[in-house]
Amino acid sequence: MADKSDLNALSGRFRGYYPVVIDVETAGFNAQSDALLEIAAVTLQMNKEGWLLPDETLHFHVEPFEGANLQPEALAFNGIDPTNPLRGAVSEHDALHAIFKAVRKGIKDKGCNRAIIVAHNANFDHSFVMAAAERASLKRNPFHPFATFDTAALSGLVLGQTVLAKACLAAGIPFDSSQAHSALYDTLQTAKLFCELVNRWKKLGGWPLPAAESE
């Protein structure tokens, strides 16, 4: 029989993956050519009863890499002025180095094997993280090179909504549209949403799996 404490551990919930919620704000849609301007990450924890909860938060404004495209439409959409000195922006290297270091520690502390990005429309955020890590020559990237947990897809299944704000409201999570398109706010709300989706599945009896309980 499977040890219930293992099933209630973060390492046992997602096949050894350590989920980290990420959101990025950018100056366009092309991860290779357009600037990464802001990134936030929220790590997750599981309590002894097996409920998923947000843990630590990291947030950085990021300097555009040399030669980066800055699409005016994207800047108008997210309201970011890359030239504003009050942003306190750091290099892609410094931002990702700090996030990767915290994530590697979380992997070790939680007994997991590798990190996996959780994001809303995750391919977008994943592509920018991977491109920035390559530009910064960061060799110890803890994230899976292509697998993700996409809260847009999960919300479509569970809640019938795919837009972050609408999914949060459908899940009973307040969403302030005036704060949307801030990487920090969107990451915090996405983390709450992912936890709600995972925990709701548990409440409905979907986890632990019956087969796991009867082994």
UniProtKB/Swiss-Prot annotation:
<dbReference type="GO" id="GO:0045004">
    <property type="term" value="P:DNA replication proofreading"/>
</dbReference>
<comment type="similarity">
    <text>Belongs to the RNase T family.</text>
</comment>
<keyword id="KW-0378">Hydrolase</keyword>
<keyword id="KW-0540">Nuclease</keyword>
<feature type="site" description="Important for substrate binding and specificity">
    <location>
        <position position="77"/>
    </location>
</feature>
<dbReference type="GO" id="GO:0008033">
    <property type="term" value="P:tRNA processing"/>
</dbReference>
<dbReference type="GO" id="GO:0005829">
    <property type="term" value="C:cytosol"/>
</dbReference>
<dbReference type="GO" id="GO:0003676">
    <property type="term" value="F:nucleic acid binding"/>
</dbReference>
<feature type="binding site">
    <location>
        <position position="23"/>
    </location>
    <ligand>
        <name>Mg(2+) 1</name>
    </ligand>
</feature>
<dbReference type="InterPro" id="IPR036397">
    <property type="entry name" value="RNaseH_sf"/>
</dbReference>
<dbReference type="InterPro" id="IPR013520">
    <property type="entry name" value="Exonuclease_RNaseT/DNA_pol3"/>
</dbReference>
<dbReference type="GO" id="GO:0008408">
    <property type="term" value="F:3'-5' exonuclease activity"/>
</dbReference>
<keyword id="KW-0460">Magnesium</keyword>
<feature type="site" description="Important for substrate binding and specificity">
    <location>
        <position position="124"/>
    </location>
</feature>
<protein>
    <recommendedName>
        <fullName>Ribonuclease T</fullName>
        <ecNumber>3.1.13.-</ecNumber>
    </recommendedName>
</protein>
<feature type="binding site">
    <location>
        <position position="181"/>
    </location>
    <ligand>
        <name>Mg(2+) 2</name>
    </ligand>
</feature>
<feature type="binding site">
    <location>
        <position position="23"/>
    </location>
    <ligand>
        <name>Mg(2+) 2</name>
    </ligand>
</feature>
<comment type="subunit">
    <text>Homodimer.</text>
</comment>
<feature type="site" description="Important for substrate binding and specificity">
    <location>
        <position position="29"/>
    </location>
</feature>
<dbReference type="Pfam" id="PF00929">
    <property type="entry name" value="RNase_T"/>
</dbReference>
<keyword id="KW-0479">Metal-binding</keyword>
<feature type="binding site">
    <location>
        <position position="186"/>
    </location>
    <ligand>
        <name>Mg(2+) 2</name>
    </ligand>
</feature>
<feature type="domain" description="Exonuclease">
    <location>
        <begin position="20"/>
        <end position="194"/>
    </location>
</feature>
<dbReference type="GO" id="GO:0000287">
    <property type="term" value="F:magnesium ion binding"/>
</dbReference>
<comment type="function">
    <text>Trims short 3' overhangs of a variety of RNA species, leaving a one or two nucleotide 3' overhang. Responsible for the end-turnover of tRNA: specifically removes the terminal AMP residue from uncharged tRNA (tRNA-C-C-A). Also appears to be involved in tRNA biosynthesis.</text>
</comment>
<dbReference type="InterPro" id="IPR005987">
    <property type="entry name" value="RNase_T"/>
</dbReference>
<keyword id="KW-0269">Exonuclease</keyword>
<dbReference type="GO" id="GO:0016896">
    <property type="term" value="F:RNA exonuclease activity, producing 5'-phosphomonoesters"/>
</dbReference>
<keyword id="KW-0819">tRNA processing</keyword>
<feature type="active site" description="Proton donor/acceptor">
    <location>
        <position position="181"/>
    </location>
</feature>
<feature type="binding site">
    <location>
        <position position="25"/>
    </location>
    <ligand>
        <name>Mg(2+) 2</name>
    </ligand>
</feature>
<feature type="site" description="Important for substrate binding and specificity">
    <location>
        <position position="146"/>
    </location>
</feature>
<dbReference type="InterPro" id="IPR012337">
    <property type="entry name" value="RNaseH-like_sf"/>
</dbReference>
